[in-house]
Amino acid sequence: MIRNFVAKFTLLSLLALLFVACNDAVTYSEMKEKERNAVNRFIKENGIKVISFADFVANDSVTDVAKNEFVEIDGVYMQIVNNPADAADALKLKDGESRTFLVRYNEYNIQEGDTISTNIYMGEPDEMRVTNNSGTFSATFTSGVMMALYSTSYVPSGWLTPFGFLYFTRSTSNLAKVNLIVPHTKGTSNASTYVYPCLYSITFQPERSYVYDED
């Protein structure tokens, strides 16, 4: 299933490359402006309330889902849909730790209005290895759709924005979940090349050993 998905994606990427080659009169500045307009339009059309980082912190790092709040952090708009901080087994990724997370996601091109990829209906989730180095997070994919689709282990840096604020649990009914509006500068290699923003809906589940590790 992943192989067929990747083949289709590769064809679409080649068509996109052909389009860019035929439309090379468009400048990078114009592409960025088009991206900004797409994000602003998406925010307006979906009734998203953007709050400041200061308000986010003052509210205990909570975004009110009922009010459709997103907080902007370094160009990424983040909505924390569920943060299982009160779960009995809730843990954060501590300084110096590296852990594997199981990830379910949906990737939506805001500019074109199309779903690019998803593993929601796949048999296995994607896996990503995340490291906390003094509050700076880095990650690599170790398996899954994203790794196969983009032929790289690189995790979009925008995906790491929530890690400083989230708690994690293995309970499938209480997984950490976020919605992210990610600009091309913090997105996939394709997003960076063709300059488009994406909406990601992502759940994170730590690998089993994470819950039982000793301090």
List each model region and its residues.
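Cross-family detector of peptidyl-prolyl cis-trans isomerase
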Residues: I2, C22-D215
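Sec-dependent bacterial lipoprotein signal peptides
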Residues: M1-C22
